C-alpha cells in the first residue's frame, strides 16, 4: 500500500507491507529515507483486501511509528544537551565525541552514522531523521556524567529543570 502527499514544501511518501506477523514501513521525504520492520503480537487477518489486527496495541504501535517517520523525513529530530560544571569540555575528533567531564580520564564514544553532531561551546546539538537513534545516543551521553542533585552539575537536556536538594545543616 502506498500513500503520498505532495505540496510545495512538504513532500513525503509512505509504503507499507503487512505480512502474517510483521509490518514493514518505509517512509521517504526531502530529508531522507527511513525503513523499519515491526513484529506483531497477533497475526493480521485479511478479509476483502482489508487487514484487521486483533491486538489494539499493535495498531497503536504502527500509527505511532508512521507519525515519527513522517516527522523525521519532513523536519527531523533535534536534541540539545548542555554541560553544566566547572571545566566540562566536549570535543569532536573525527567520528568520535570526547568528553572531559571531571574524571581522571576522557570519556569517548563513536557517533552513529545517522546522527549529526554540532558543538557550540558547552552545548551539544544532536540531529537525525531517526528519532530512535538520536534519543538513544543522547541517553548514552547523559550516562557519562549523571546529574548531581546537590550542585546541579552534569549533562542536562536544554529544557531540563533540576530541583536541588538541601545539603547538610551544621
Swiss-Prot record:
One of the protein's GO biological processes: translation
Annotated Pfam families: Ribosomal_L6 (PF00347)
Localization of this protein: Mitochondrion
GO CC field: mitochondrial large ribosomal subunit
UniProt KW keywords: Mitochondrion, Ribonucleoprotein, Ribosomal protein
InterPro entries: Ribosomal_uL6-like (IPR000702), Ribosomal_uL6-like_a/b-dom_sf (IPR036789), Ribosomal_uL6_a/b-dom (IPR020040), Ribosomal_uL6_bac-type (IPR019906)
Molecular functions (GO terms): rRNA binding; structural constituent of ribosome
Family the entry assigns: Belongs to the universal ribosomal protein uL6 family.
Protein name: Large ribosomal subunit protein uL6m
Gene that produces this protein: mrpl6
Amino acid at each position: 500500500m502506498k500513500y503520498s502527499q505532495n505540496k510545495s514544501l512538504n513532500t513525503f511518501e509512505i509504503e507499507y507491507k503487512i505480512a502474517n506477523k510483521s509490518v514493514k514501513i518505509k517512509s521517504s521525504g526531502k530529508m531522507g529515507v527511513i525503513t523499519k520492520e515491526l513484529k506483531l503480537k497477533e497475526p493480521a487477518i485479511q478479509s476483502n483486501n482489508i487487514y484487521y489486527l486483533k491486538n489494539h496495541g499493535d495498531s497503536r504501535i504502527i500509527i505511532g511509528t508512521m507519525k515519527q517517520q513522517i516527522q523525521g523525513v519532513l523536519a527531523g529530530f533535534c536534541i540539545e544537551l548542555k554541560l553544566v560544571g566547572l571545566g566540562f569540555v566536549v570535543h569532536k575528533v573525527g567520528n568520535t565525541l570526547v568528553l572531559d567531564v571531571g574524571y581522571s580520564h576522557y570519556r569517548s564514544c563513536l557517533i552513529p552514522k545517522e546522527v549529526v553532531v554540532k558543538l557550540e561551546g558547552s552545548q551539544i546539538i544532536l540531529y537525525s531523521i531517526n528519532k530512535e537513534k538520536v534519543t538513544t545516543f543522547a541517553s548514552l551521553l547523559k550516562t557519562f556524567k549523571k546529574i548531581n542533585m546537590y550542585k546541579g552539575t552534569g549533562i542536562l537536556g536544554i529544557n531540563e529543570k533540576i530541583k536541588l536538594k538541601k545539603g547538610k545543616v551544621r
